[in-house]
């Protein structure tokens, strides 16, 4: 991929472990500008999903990159393509059976009688941060052809495992 030297290229990936009751989620970024890696970041938390973590990290990145910039998020997670779409009543209250992004989450939420959320709180913050910039977009890339994307997933998975381990050590 040919890069424009004025654009910030933000490789972003996430990971979530639906198999644990404390369900850790994580996200990581590698930021390129002027053909150089200028920053790496990773976040994780318990009782969340990789999608919430990815949106949270997108907000942080858009806040930290200088105002008026061009930003392109590169990912294999189609979910975040809607980071700048105003939440509707339907998307904010999507039933778990309508969730197309995480069938495991849908099954899990459905079995507990809850609705899967479309993260309207984070989408609104993304929209606000996007307004500070000249342009912000998302490009879907192939995972196996993108070493920096693979790195983000690995770092998110490591952070998630560390968060879970610290939780269990603290609660022994």
Show where each model-derived region lies.
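RNase H catalytic domain
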Residues: 15-21, 59-153
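Alpha-helix boundary/interfacial micro-motifs
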Residues: 30-31, 93-95, 168-170
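Short, surface-exposed, polar/charged, turn-prone segments marking secondary-structure boundaries
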Residues: 36-40, 58-59, 101-102, 124-127, ...
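Intrinsic disorder/low-structure terminal segments
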Residues: 7-8, 72, 142, 166
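RNase H-like nuclease fold core
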Residues: 1-52, 63-64, 162-164
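Charged phosphate-binding loop/patch that engages nucleotide di/tri-phosphates or the phosphate backbone
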Residues: 150-172
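Loop-to-helix element that buttresses phosphate recognition and phosphoryl-transfer chemistry
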Residues: 53, 57
């Amino acid at each position: 991929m040919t890069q424009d030297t004025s654009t910030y290229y933000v490789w972003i990936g996430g990971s979530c472990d639906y198999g644990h009751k404390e369900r850790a989620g994580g996200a990581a970024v590698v930021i390129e500008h002027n053909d150089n890696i200028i920053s790496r970041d990773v976040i994780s938390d318990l009782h969340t999903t990789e999608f919430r973590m990815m949106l949270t990290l997108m907000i942080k990145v858009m806040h930290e990159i200088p105002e008026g910039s061009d930003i392109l998020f590169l990912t294999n997670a189609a979910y975040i393509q809607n980071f700048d779409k105003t939440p509707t009543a339907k998307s904010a209250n999507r039933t778990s059976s309508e969730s197309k992004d995480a069938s495991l989450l849908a099954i899990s939420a459905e079995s507990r009688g809850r609705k899967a959320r479309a993260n309207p709180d984070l989408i609104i913050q993304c929209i606000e941060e996007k307004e500070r910039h000249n342009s912000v977009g998302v490009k879907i890339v192939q995972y196996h052809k993108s070493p920096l994307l693979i790195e983000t997933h690995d770092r998110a998975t490591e952070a998630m495992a560390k968060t879970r381990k610290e939780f269990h050590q603290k609660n022994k």
